[in-house]
Amino acid sequence: MAKPSSGLVHRHTPNLEVYNARGMSVRQVAYLKADEQEPMQRLVTLTRRSANEQWRGQWDPRLFERLEQETDLAPSQQVTSALSGVTLLEESRDAGWRLTLHGEAGQATHAWDSRASHWQTEYDELLRPVLIRETAGGQPTRVAESFSYAREEGLNRRGRLVRHDDDAGSRMIDSYGLTGQELGETRHFLAALDLPDWPDAALEPGAGASTHWRYGPLDQVLEQTDAQGHRQCSGFTLGGELTRLTLHLNDGRQHPLLVETRYNAFGQVERQTLGNDVVRHAQYDPANGRLERMQASRPGRSQLQDLLYGYDPVGNVTRIEDLSQPVRHFANQRIDPVSNFVYDSLYRLTEASGREAVGAMIGPGLPELTPFPGDTSQLLNYGQQYHYDASGNLLSLRHVGQQDYTRSLNVAADSNRAVPAPGNPLEAFDGNGNLLQLAPGQPLQWNARNQLHSTRQVARTDGDDEEHYRYGGNRLRLRKVISRRVAGRQRRSETRYLPGLELHESEGERLAVITVDTGHGLIRCLHWSEGQPEGIANPQLRYSLDDLHDSSGLELDGDARIISHEGYYPFGGTAWWAAGSAIEASYKTRRYSGKERDSSGLYDYGLRYYAPWLMRWINPDPGGDVDGLNRYRFVRNNPLTLTDHFGLNPQDQHYSIKKFSKEPKEPGAERMLNGLGESGMSLLRGKGPIAEFAYNTNWSVREYLHLGASNQAGDIKRSDYEAATAGSHMRDLIGSQPLHRSRAEHSLAASTGFCDEFGIISVFLMASSADWPNVPIYSVKQPVHRSAILGDPRITDPLTVDPWVTYPVVHPWSQSHNSTGNVELSNFTPRMPGDPEYAIGYQQVDALREQHYQDLPVFDDDVMEARLDSWLATGKVWTQVSAMKDPQSVFYVLDGQQQNAAAIPSVQYDATYESLMHVARLRSNPRFAGRLRAF
């Protein structure tokens, strides 16, 4: 039984960061303690930099300890950069090497990797990719992807992508909305499973599978019509939150799925009424917003779910109790419906306890299905202990229960590649770090892009049991084909994945699974056109009651009858499951974290696969080192607290750009800027979506840094000098030249910053946004200022993003003070919309805020007034109202309506007005007037 930690393991275990003389991070030191009685262990991550301060190599804590004896020891990862700073060669002990050559505009033209694969990307005159040639090791060259763009006007498609050919087939975009959303797409699948060579690949005959969307004014999906004509209709609050969902089947039947939703003031769901009359309640800690209790009940019947969550001070889940289940006694044990969790000083899970079924073990398979869902009377207690090395590799799992066992992994000495003992990790992976077999006789095959191509469970001379996978241009799985030998015959089944719809076809059965995400649980509608199983309704609605991490615990039908009940070990293995019907249970595919579990036991997370019995990913992170130097580690070994949605990096939440353009504006507020009322410039019509994105970025940064700028006189006075105090403390902590991410995280924790922080947060938010409008993002650095632009100034006139000024207005770069003088541009263009490399997580920022910014000193007004006077005298404080050379309104067209980039969101008006009034008073004071600085 895991006992709650006393907290003593966390005493005197700070995280340290060491900077060189130029303010660049060169060493990170963590102190590990897993037990109160154990000595503390120092873990050092070393970074070596070149003369121009670019990092060249990094050594993880295991390799660092060997550096004293092996001075020429190669790092965990290293890069070779061009003189411009762009990365040419990346070398990773986990993921192999990758060489990339770039064109004059910074676009990647050629790439090679350690599996002898080669890619060549061709671009059109607008630097849009038009085709990607791929040469896998030892294979002939093929055109793996092809892109076509519309030249003609109509359907808002001009200049936009209208066809994308990929490994699964072709995707045609029928039309776009005024703000750039796709209104319709058609997917054509390949006739064969062979990898295509475009344009010669053969598509299946027919019209393809078409999906259509209808959007509301806040860009929310009001209606989705899937490829079989089923419609999902959604209703929203005035603020854009989902309140109801109705499913209209193609045969005319209608099913309310979500009847009502109620939110608290922070946008968190407090109450949901589902279409089967189940009511869900959620309670949150008002101090930090953490979920405290989650309940689900049926009117007039027993409680279905009542989960009570406990946390330590930094937010790690330490206890989960199911109050809907009674205390049981079985096999001479008292079985409490409680799970407890203990962590070391690095917040890695070290102990866990809970309940499991008789005979359950962590492995690729599921435990034996037991009858009577909801009856937990025959579960047993278990306890687990986890041991890690200095780099975060799980070395062993010790399980104590009905069956005691220990699982050990052998980790390579020079990398984080690991396999179950007594396997040899040096032989178990290819050059890019992809695992080559799940178990002896079960090989894994990978395509050139390090995506799982096929798995084989059983090898036979007369037909194997295997699965094949194909992926779309977004790198997500679109097709799964299963071949099995049954009763002397080879049988094939196939699943195709479309927006909101899965099409399953096998011998004698055709099944469409309509998937609806309520945001707090998945609803699936099983609709058979052929081969309906006996005893199952057609259609059958399945409501999933999920836990904190979206794992499907209870499945209910349309009458709130329990279909299945499942519990999980901390790292995702199924500890027990029960169902009244084995046939019904066999149609459950979404389990741990809401992800699909394949017959191999692997979970498909989207961008890679997870093996719960290994408690690690089976290939390196496709996002690189976004989650640290260990590219196999699963959610930082903290699976109860963190969630990974796509297989890139664990985040509970991250900062995002809010849609201030859709919110009410303060009438006439723009007159504070220039007094000109309706006068101003107009942007080209095609700039509308980009201008909206820039507008939302400006005001999102202003909201997150709500104290204002640390060196703007108006914001300093408005915040009662708190902006200056917190900003000065932040700069003392991060030094003169911190890493961009560290700068952004500390600034968000302090709720203020200087122009450097405002500018860096802007580019991080834009590059990590799913709404990124596919234009280059640059950080703009001048001798005394930093801002951002959307667009490449060598090709077009970009739009300026500068939320540091008191009154930010989106405007052309050519009309900006930020374009004058000596200007240095740094490229922050993401690889994809929502690029996780730039995502900033709330958890890290909250931890910094609690550690460094909670109890800042408060000085008397006289003291701060004297300091402000000193800052004004030395030119450290500004009154920069606008970044425009000629401050004026800027108009752009969106949704057919003219918008003004100088309009202030109503929720931001009071703060902006107060800062401007302070500026006016300071400028009218003869004592200050000559000292105020502005462009």
Predicted regions and their residues:
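A structural boundary/capping signal
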Residues: 652-935
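Thioester-forming pentapeptide GCGEQ
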Residues: 1-45, 50, 208, 217-220
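Acidic/glycine-rich beta-solenoid
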Residues: 35, 64-81, 94-95, 129-162, ...
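Short turn/helix-capping motifs enriched in Asx and small/polar residues
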Residues: 382, 561-577, 601, 607-608, ...
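A motif-centric feature for acidic-aromatic and gly/ser/thr-rich catalytic loops and repeats
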Residues: 533-606
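Short, flexible loop/turn elements at secondary-structure junctions
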Residues: 20-21, 32, 51, 62, ...
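Glycine-rich, acidic and aromatic/proline-enriched surface loops and short helix-turn segments
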Residues: 17-24, 51-54, 61, 188, ...
